[in-house]
UniProtKB/Swiss-Prot annotation:
EC class (word): isomerase
Catalytic residues of the enzyme: H92 (electrophile), E161 (proton acceptor)
Protein name according to UniProt: Triosephosphate isomerase
Gene: tpiA
Family: Belongs to the triosephosphate isomerase family.
Function: Involved in the gluconeogenesis. Catalyzes stereospecifically the conversion of dihydroxyacetone phosphate (DHAP) to D-glyceraldehyde-3-phosphate (G3P).
Compartments where found: Cytoplasm
Pathway participation: Carbohydrate biosynthesis; gluconeogenesis; Carbohydrate degradation; glycolysis; D-glyceraldehyde 3-phosphate from glycerone phosphate: step 1/1
Pfam families: TIM
GO molecular-function term, one example from the UniProt record: triose-phosphate isomerase activity
Length: 235
């Protein structure tokens, strides 16, 4: 199974996402994609659409670990269920750094949505300073981001996104990707995605790299042409 996912972050309006989704479903129909390809997109909360498309799934970028309640600025399971959404990103570095989500908080979110049967995209990644400390330090750092996470959960997808490569246009080298993914494969048998400045130019090489089961795409997923070019690179 190859997984191609697009994280829209705080981009695209509801109308833009609706247009994007309609075009994507049509293009995937024409491509006659196989059952070995999974395509997911993650719009912002105000742009969520009902998850009823033929060839791809809608997921959420974030949600609080509750059915509903007094959690200003958040959404809960009830809101996701209304859209028939059962996919969620957890642990993204921007949630960890910008919003102060620590490992205990992330663990609670993971357990809640695992119990709800969600497919979970669990993100891990290191700052450049940590990578520069060497392989053992990197292994310890990434391993700590898996503390408390059930790595045997059958609907777990691990997305490795080196923080220094996110949104910078500077992807990790193929050697760095293979080395890190091979190390992560000693922790878990879950699918391993790479994220960090993935684009139509480098997607095929990344997808052909050993231990890489797919990609989590950021800015290159916002344009239907570039995103579908990345999907085509998986064939």
């Amino acid at each position: 199974m190859t997984i191609i996912a697009g994280n829209f972050k705080a981009n695209l309006t509801r109308i833009q996402v609706a247009t994007f989704a309609k075009e994507l479903d049509s293009i995937l129909t024409d491509m006659q994609t196989s059952s070995h390809l999974q395509v997911d997109i993650f719009p912002s909360h105000t742009a969520l659409l009902t998850n009823n498309f033929k060839h791809f799934h809608i997921g959420a970028q974030n949600a609080y670990f509750a059915q509903n309640g007094g959690f200003t600025g958040e959404i809960g399971l009830s809101q996701l269920q209304e859209f028939n959404i059962n996919r969620l990103i957890i642990g993204h570095s921007e949630r960890r750094t910008l919003f102060g989500e620590n490992q205990d908080f992330i663990n609670k979110k993971f357990r809640f949505y695992a119990e709800a049967g969600f497919e979970i995209y669990y993100c891990i990644g290191e700052p450049l300073s940590m990578r520069q400390k060497g392989k053992n330090a990197l292994k310890d750092f990434l391993g700590a981001q898996l503390d408390g996470i059930d790595i045997t959960y059958p609907k777990l997808i691990i997305a490795y996104e080196p923080i220094w490569a996110i949104g910078t246009g500077e992807s990790a080298t193929l050697e760095q990707i293979e080395s890190t993914h091979s190390m992560l494969a000693t922790f878990t048998s879950a699918p391993l995605l790479y994220g960090g400045s993935v684009n139509p130019t480098n997607a095929r090489e990344i997808l052909c790299t050993p231990y890489v089961n797919g990609v989590l795409v950021g800015s290159a997923s916002l344009n239907i042409q570039s995103f579908t070019d990345i999907i085509r690179a998986s064939k």
